[in-house]
Amino acid sequence: FLVVHLRMTGQFKLLEKDVLACTHTRVRFFEENGRELRFIDIRNFGQMWHVPYSKSVSEIVSGIKRLGPEPFSADFNSHYLKEYLKTKTRSIKSALLDQETVAGVGNIYADESLFDAGINPKIKSKHLNKTDLNKLCNSLTKILRISIGEGGTTFSDFRDLEGINGNYGGQAWV
C-alpha cells in the first residue's frame, strides 16, 4: 500500500481524462476508465512511501515511531502532557510544534489553542499545572474540530479536493 504525507501544499485531485498536467504534478495514477488521480505539490515537500504487505509502516516510514499521540486519541490528555513535559524547559508553544509531543499540530493551531486556553505561549512547559494542561487539551481539540469543520486554514495556496479555500482563518483569534 501507499503512505502519503501531504506536508504544507500537497493535495490529490481526481480528474476526468484529457486534462493537461500542471507543472506541480508530482505523481499520476491512471484508472482504466481514463480518469486520473494526481498528487500535486507546489512546494515539493510532500512524501510517498510504498509499504509492502510484509512490512509494518514504521519499518518504512522514517520518523513515525517518534510521533506523539494524535490530538483526538485517548492517549492525548492532561496526564500524558504533564508526564511528558515535566522536565521540558522549552516554551509550551515550541513543545506543541514538536511532533514528538503531539502529532499534527502546526503554528496556527498551536497559537489558537494557547490563546483559547489563556496560556502564554512563552511559558516553560514544565511550569504548566494540570488545570492549565486540561484547558490546553480541550482547547486544542476544540480548535481542530472547528477548523476541520471549516475546511482548514488557507493562508496561501491550500485548497480542499474541490479546489475550495479553507475558511477557519476568518475565525482565528491570533
Predicted regions and their residues:
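Structured catalytic/nucleic-acid-binding cores of DNA maintenance enzymes
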Residues: 1-174
